[in-house]
């Protein structure tokens, strides 16, 4: 049930009947304060200006055409021409009841699209670090939301599995296998990469061999392809452990690395030349873009092939967008890549559009995000100033959560404690990130993220168990409430019901904007409203059975909404804390 969409349609019809153009924007929003009703329509001012009418006069005319019978019990004009809409308690009650009868809590499915989501993208032969965390968990929350809404989502893990470094890595892997006379487990990927680089920098013969291996690998030599595959397999197996720990839905089947697009690159360069988009410049192949200027104010040159014949990331990204449209048949492509890559992506996509590889009707969206900072406001590092490994971060989260849970539950059996600590620790790391607007940098702070107050995972997980405890105390089976009526007589009941019915609107925003923090804010607000409702509207000691059962149903929908909302974020819920 999308009340905002329903009201937008009704207000739009009334505006048109009052003389507004057919494309007028009703601007229906959720009200910020209860005294302004549940929704406000703010579109009158803009339309009044176009029509040359006083806004309040137009608002009064709109009201004569506005049919909200059975939806709102009060509609009033406020200020210069805002229309405040108060939802009818009977309307709220019937839709709460309908939501409880639906597995999807009454959430409708929009027209299904094929949506490619590019996220995570670690590098081969390197261990995942905290820099991969934001793309991985924000992208996965978007994927879960889009899938819940019924879209066909193609996860694209654009791993760095190609490039000149593979000559060096294969040469070192070969050396290790010869010296160790057997299979080598790349347990320490960082160490392996570091040692390979050291050999490359200090041993001229090794470096020469590495360079020759690049040529052989790129030429498709089977031995070198096999060595390359081994490096990719070992890396992705290790990454999968991190994905599993993070409760992220990526699997090996979602890997679409840079190597996938490599065979397309010569054809793309030739095609861009044929279309007169690319030209030779100082031995390299360059696309000059009028949309971007260099320091001299001239069109910026984007290199797509170097003098030595090598290709660049831009060339790969052009091929990648083309592949996603032509082969994967994407209706929309979302890229969860940090904000520093914005200009690079925009330039690649400008070339893609000019070449006609992806039509304008297919959005290419950079859902960029800021950096993860330490308490000092600088990039998050180890005490020694190194990069924080993702596995170390998750280990610490688990250890801190274990101590926290044990302190609050000294008698909890070890197995249950471990399960709860995992849900709280991993949930805390993810939620701390997801609850911030992704476009900004955010401060990583253990104390804040593991707090049981405020907009945190432990608070949200606790809020969920608190709602469930009502049913344990009532000693009632939820199915016994199926035929009970929802009756809304108190303001707190109405406020909670209205917020519960805004779940679909929240999902719609997350799906459209790729902003999971909107869902976090909604769930936090919902938990707060339930708290006020629980305090002021006695459930188990209600005046009569009708009120008791009705309030239990509001509690039931609150629990289901919290659980489903947290699930779209990839945050695990627990039954007890």
From Swiss-Prot:
Its EC number is 6.1.1.19. The keyword Nucleotidyltransferase does not apply. GO terms for molecular function: arginine-tRNA ligase activity; ATP binding. One of its GO terms (cellular component) is cytoplasm. A motif ('HIGH' region) lies at residues 122-132. It catalyses: tRNA(Arg) + L-arginine + ATP = L-arginyl-tRNA(Arg) + AMP + diphosphate. The keyword Disulfide bond does not apply. It is found in: Cytoplasm. GO terms for biological process: arginyl-tRNA aminoacylation. Keywords: Aminoacyl-tRNA synthetase, ATP-binding, Cytoplasm, Ligase, Nucleotide-binding, Protein biosynthesis. Gene3D superfamilies: Arginyl tRNA synthetase N-terminal domain (3.30.1360.70), HUPs (3.40.50.620), Isoleucyl-tRNA Synthetase, Domain 1 (1.10.730.10). PANTHER family: ARGININE--TRNA LIGASE, CYTOPLASMIC, ARGINYL-TRNA SYNTHETASE. HAMAP family: Arg_tRNA_synth. Monomer. Belongs to the class-I aminoacyl-tRNA synthetase family. This is Arginine--tRNA ligase. It comes from Enterobacter sp. (strain 638). The lineage of its organism: Bacteria, Pseudomonadati, Pseudomonadota, Gammaproteobacteria, Enterobacterales.
